[in-house]
Amino acid sequence: MKLLIDFFPIILFFAAFKVWGIYVATAVAIAATVVQIGYIRLKHGKVEPLQWLSLGVIVLFGGATLLAHSETFIKWKPTVLYWLMGGTLLVGQLVFRKNFIQSLMGAQIDLPAPVWRNLNWGWTGFFATMGVLNLWVAYNFDTDTWVNFKLFGGIGLMFAFVIAQALYLSRHVKDEGDAAPKDLQP
């Protein structure tokens, strides 16, 4: 159910685009994200900061798309969101000496500091790359191709990256009885 709630706005955006075009799809995405946040707030009592950020970005860039009647703004939305997330990880690591990936996942998994650092850098690089890739598709292909990439390509690449991260983590996770990860044992 959580996955459906997470993908609710993008699924509706995609469907609306196929039927009515980019401007109606943009309005639908804004409304769906507002409904999504309202549902999460009612159901769980708390909305995560990333969800608020996503709402702010869709309202800002979607609103600009509708007001200016220019699809350029909505095409920039994923890039801005990716770069904000990657930038947050980067600033956290370099400026505040805080690994936000470890802060998010540290209670669920026990890893050595270098592995946490590699995860943080990996996600930072992934978000930066996805932002550039989104712009490349947006400016080199038609809007229909960009929408398909946004749904299928973006989610597919995210899924592949998560699997790669899981494989990387599986080499370093401590077993219940182990004192150290497999690759760090003498």
Swiss-Prot record:
* Summary of the function given for this chain in its UniProt record: Plays a role in cell envelope biogenesis, maintenance of cell envelope integrity and membrane homeostasis.
Q: Provide the protein name.
A: Inner membrane-spanning protein YciB
What residue ranges are annotated as transmembrane? 10-30, 47-67, 76-96, 121-141, 149-169
Q: Which keywords does the record carry?
A: Cell inner membrane, Cell membrane, Membrane, Transmembrane, Transmembrane helix
Q: Where in the cell is it found?
A: Cell inner membrane
Per the record, its GO cellular-component terms are: plasma membrane
Q: What is its main location?
A: membrane
The encoding gene = yciB
Provide an example Pfam family for this protein.
IspA
Tell me yes or no: is Transmembrane among this UniProt entry's keywords.
Answer: yes
Its organism's taxonomic lineage begins at: Bacteria, Pseudomonadati, Pseudomonadota, Betaproteobacteria, Burkholderiales
Q: Which family does it belong to?
A: Belongs to the YciB family.
UniProt membrane topology term: Multi-pass membrane protein
Q: Which domain of life is it from?
A: Bacteria
Note the NCBIfam families from the entry: ispZ, PRK00259.1-3
